[in-house]
Amino acid sequence: MWAGLFVACSVFVAFAILNVIHVYMRGLDSYESTLFGNLGMDGQRSMQIFGVWLAAALYWITTRAQRTEKEKASIYGLQHGRLHLQLPTAMWMNMGYWRNTPTSTTLSEACRDLLKAVLTEAGFLNDEGRIQRRIFLLDLGFGCGDQTIYLMSKEPIRACDKDWWDERDRCATFDHYIGITKDAVQARYASERVEELKQNEGSTISLFCADASKPTSWNEGLHTSIRQARVNSDERWILALDTAYHFSPSRWPLIEHVHSELEANYMAFDLCLSPTATWTQKTMLHLLTALMGAPWANFSTPQEYRSKLEQVGYMSEAINITDISEHVFAPLAAFLKEQDSRLKMLGLGIGRFGVAKTMFSWWGRTGVVRGVIVVAKK
């Protein structure tokens, strides 16, 4: 009904404007010196065409600006839901490990579970769920600080932390923690969170804004912190949780530095290329990786990944690569779809993450990309 009404109004307004202009121009006919002069038949035809185009433009504008009666009523009826959104909110961001259906798991819980899955594969938790060793952790890409809080705090710091916090005996803590992120905005946000943690307990935590993929670019302050942590620790680990495939020009300069200079173990959630990927799939993926800021050099098969770790110096028997793709891509795409629907009820949406939803759905459907947990011990 409303669409038809807007069409009629658009046409009426357009031709009304057309007639006003036409009458005005006719009034200028006697003035030959005027810029317009006598319109004539060609001029009248031009004015008619102009009117049609104006009507079409008005129709396009109104249809773009207006929704159906039902949709409009729904949005206006629920927009006050925005006023109930609680801030600050959890700021976890990785692909997550989805044990259950996406509708019964929050993103924060899935992100936490991906971290726990990596820690478990690395052997940090015994049957009682307690850490067996005192270690120094270098976290490459700590995001907005949620995983830092989870790894270093005995209890939730903010009220929003309680929504994803699990039993304390299932959480790992470390003696020394150094985090690196390239994102200055996230570094500032995470630093505020860590200051809140330090007020509660004297944790040995240092955060730096630097390019984790280029150890040669790290400043002296970062190098000094790492040296001090190494001296006061018996064991060293590097964590790259859903970050290493972004490292440019590739992840390997960093891993070589980790092995030779830091003499550290390596654990990560990373992406690999399926060994059965077709030429067409590889071509499409190559284009996508360029758009997502992930160098193509980082997309190797799991076997190639293992071989490269061996070339760096890790022993074959100390390398473990576990495929968890079925718990990552398809359920993440389903979650994003459901979240988009929920947010649209409030007149919002997931924005640019809609493109990511399509990509994750493709990965989950075809298996062209594999999500793996990588552990390499010295």
Question: What name fits each language-model region?
Answer:
Residues 14-86:
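N-terminal auxiliary segments of SAM/dcSAM-dependent transferases
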Residues 108-133, 150:
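Conserved alpha-helix/loop element of class I SAM-dependent methyltransferases that forms part
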Residues 136-215:
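Class I SAM-dependent methyltransferase SAM/SAH-binding core
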Residues 236-250:
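A short SAM/SAH-binding and catalytic strip from SAM-dependent methyltransferases
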Residues 252-265:
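A short glycine-rich, Lys/Arg-flanked "PGG" loop and its adjoining helix->strand segment in the class I
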Residues 272-296:
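Short, glycine-/aromatic-enriched active-site segment of Class I SAM-dependent methyltransferases
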Residues 297-313:
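Short alpha-helix
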Residues 322-378:
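Conserved Class I S-adenosyl-L-methionine
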